[in-house]
Amino acid sequence: MISHTDHQLTLIKENIKFIPNYPKQGILFRDITALLENPHAYSACIKLLADHYKNHQLTKIVGVEARGFLFGSPLALILKLGFIPARKAGRLPRNTISESYVLEYGTGCLEMHNDSIIPGDRVLIVDDLLATGGTIKAVVKLIRRLGGEVYHAAFVIDLEKLGGKLLLEKIGVHPYSLVIFSD
């Protein structure tokens, strides 16, 4: 018999589309827009993440631009936590700190308001996908520079062969993913 959780995970997997050669040649993009269009699949993601983290004594959630906002914001509401956006450079109005990083298919820079984390905050990072881990490593650096503690990061998808999980574990962050693709 299939458990309710297994049914939810199957629903999530069925709503992730594969787009070859996007955003550039040689990349197999995992598209979550169909998942977002299906309220049952989207809700299943949020519920499973909330169930996993409800007893972790967190104080804040940081969502990574832009798709991390889609999962981090509703998760923060359910867990009754503050939500902090980690945004691309130049998009936040107050004083910020920044960190550069390397993507699977380029480079980037993320910023956070320099007063959004207070020393001792226990922070969960949320994004849609874990690839190489470079983006999340940059967010971890930002949070730790502000005095926050970060030991957990949540994802809908983990592209296992790209090594992000291993990178995060090396810096003391435990990744949790709903769906793991090993291809």
UniProtKB/Swiss-Prot annotation:
<dbReference type="InterPro" id="IPR005764">
    <property type="entry name" value="Ade_phspho_trans"/>
</dbReference>
<dbReference type="GO" id="GO:0005829">
    <property type="term" value="C:cytosol"/>
</dbReference>
<keyword id="KW-0963">Cytoplasm</keyword>
<dbReference type="Pfam" id="PF00156">
    <property type="entry name" value="Pribosyltran"/>
</dbReference>
<dbReference type="GO" id="GO:0044209">
    <property type="term" value="P:AMP salvage"/>
</dbReference>
<dbReference type="GO" id="GO:0006166">
    <property type="term" value="P:purine ribonucleoside salvage"/>
</dbReference>
<comment type="similarity">
    <text>Belongs to the purine/pyrimidine phosphoribosyltransferase family.</text>
</comment>
<comment type="function">
    <text>Catalyzes a salvage reaction resulting in the formation of AMP, that is energically less costly than de novo synthesis.</text>
</comment>
<keyword id="KW-0660">Purine salvage</keyword>
<dbReference type="GO" id="GO:0006168">
    <property type="term" value="P:adenine salvage"/>
</dbReference>
<dbReference type="InterPro" id="IPR050120">
    <property type="entry name" value="Adenine_PRTase"/>
</dbReference>
<dbReference type="InterPro" id="IPR000836">
    <property type="entry name" value="PRibTrfase_dom"/>
</dbReference>
<keyword id="KW-0808">Transferase</keyword>
<dbReference type="InterPro" id="IPR029057">
    <property type="entry name" value="PRTase-like"/>
</dbReference>
<keyword id="KW-0328">Glycosyltransferase</keyword>
<comment type="pathway">
    <text>Purine metabolism; AMP biosynthesis via salvage pathway; AMP from adenine: step 1/1.</text>
</comment>
<protein>
    <recommendedName>
        <fullName>Adenine phosphoribosyltransferase</fullName>
        <ecNumber>2.4.2.7</ecNumber>
    </recommendedName>
</protein>
<comment type="subunit">
    <text>Homodimer.</text>
</comment>
<dbReference type="GO" id="GO:0003999">
    <property type="term" value="F:adenine phosphoribosyltransferase activity"/>
</dbReference>
